[in-house]
Regions:
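Short beta-strand->loop
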Residues: 81-92, 142, 238-254, 263-265
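Conserved C-terminal helix/tail region of periplasmic/extracytoplasmic solute-binding proteins
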Residues: 211, 319-350
Length: 350
């Protein structure tokens, strides 16, 4: 038994860099109980933030969580080490169809393991929107991207995500342009559209809107499906009659996949694999999905999930809605730079 005890002591730590509001309530505590490995946990709320750290080369992390369309470029830049599947006994639990989709960004699924997936759309306060716009439900991006609507909504508060990568494709797609355009003229059009509504945006932030929707501080937010789900759950818990809903507008929204990857500079590679393998247990990821309101790639988790959540169309959209979504492609660095400049203009309103 002596060697075992040493093994546990040496189990050490795993440094995790994940999206905000994106893990189960007890996942980290449970992981430490089960493995003896101590998780050290930090959060970010945009792909741009994570990419900046990864491409600078010294991350200090062992597990990071990029989105599908950023992954390919990061792999090519040598940001990750290959996953050792012999250390992932639970790998077979993953949905083969989803793994196949991810091969577009990670040929042979060598560097990344799917974590959760979701959509971008609009979260809103049902009663306030009815009062201000006179509609029972939101079904179009026009609510956020047309001046006449935004003028009215400014009185109850509107938030946009603080990310070129999340917002510009949504505007382009709404305008009938290619959401994955490489044409500078398209981004100019999207930028002009956004500058017109810019005066009515309360703030740009990619996570604060959860609590602000829940407590009635804002009435509409461009946001991630599960974050709006969490706002709705918090509002219901508070019992103050704030009624939150989520819409994937008829023009479509972004469908994305977030993955687990191990940075090149990870010094706790075994522990990183242990954490990833832990998340591949159906009962573990079921609890994560139940808490954060994002879909998971683990079919074995379906029956273990809270069925009201598993059947919630905001969490698992039906095929007809999925058909309207678009997936972001990996864009050339020069288009990414253009988007970043464009976004800075929108935010400063100049």
């Amino acid at each position: 038994g002596l060697t075992m005890a040493v093994g546990v002591q040496a189990a050490g730590t795993v440094h995790i860099y994940n999206w905000s509001d994106y893990i189960g309530e007890t996942t980290l505590v449970d992981f430490e109980k089960e493995t003896g490995i101590k998780p050290v946990y930090d959060v970010f709320d945009s792909n741009e933030t994570l990419e900046g750290k990864l491409l600078a080369g010294r991350t200090g992390y062992d597990v990071v969580v990029p989105s599908n369309h950023f992954l390919g470029k990061q792999i090519k830049a040598g940001a990750f080490q290959k996953i050792d599947k012999s250390l992932l006994g639970n790998y077979a639990n993953l949905d083969p169809a989803l793994l196949k989709r991810l091969e577009k960004n990670d040929p042979g699924n060598q560097y990344a393991v799917p974590y959760l997936w979701g959509t971008n759309g609009i979260g809103y306060n049902v009663d306030k929107v009815k009062e201000v716009l006179g509609v029972d439900k939101i079904d179009s991006w026009a609510v956020l991207f047309e001046q006449q609507n935004m003028k009215k909504l400014a009185s109850c508060g509107v938030s946009f995500m603080d990310s070129a990568d999340e917002m510009l494709p949504a505007v382009g797609n709404y305008m009938g342009l290619d959401p994955n355009s490489t044409n500078p003229a398209d981004y100019k059009k999207a930028e002009e559209k956004l500058l017109k509504v810019r005066p009515y945006v309360t703030y740009f932030h990619s996570s604060k809107y959860i609590s602000d929707l829940a407590n009635g501080n804002i009435c509409v937010a461009a946001g991630f499906s599960g974050d709006v789900f969490q706002a709705k759950a918090r509002a219901a818990e508070a019992g103050k009659g704030v009624n939150i809903a989520y819409a994937i507008p008829k023009e479509g929204g972004n469908l994305w996949f977030d993955v687990l990857a191990i940075p090149k500079d990870s010094t706790n590679v075994k522990e990183a694999h242990a954490f990833i393998n832990y998340l591949l247990q159906p009962e573990v990821i079921a609890q994560v999905s139940d808490y954060v309101g994002y879909a998971n790639p683990n079919p074995g988790a379906d029956t273990l999930m809270e069925q009201s959540i598993r059947t919630d169309e905001a969490v698992y959209p039906p095929q007809a809605v999925l058909n309207r979504t678009f997936v972001n492609f990996e864009l050339p660095p020069k288009v990414q730079r253009l988007m970043t400049r464009s976004w800075t203009k929108v935010k400063t309103g100049k």
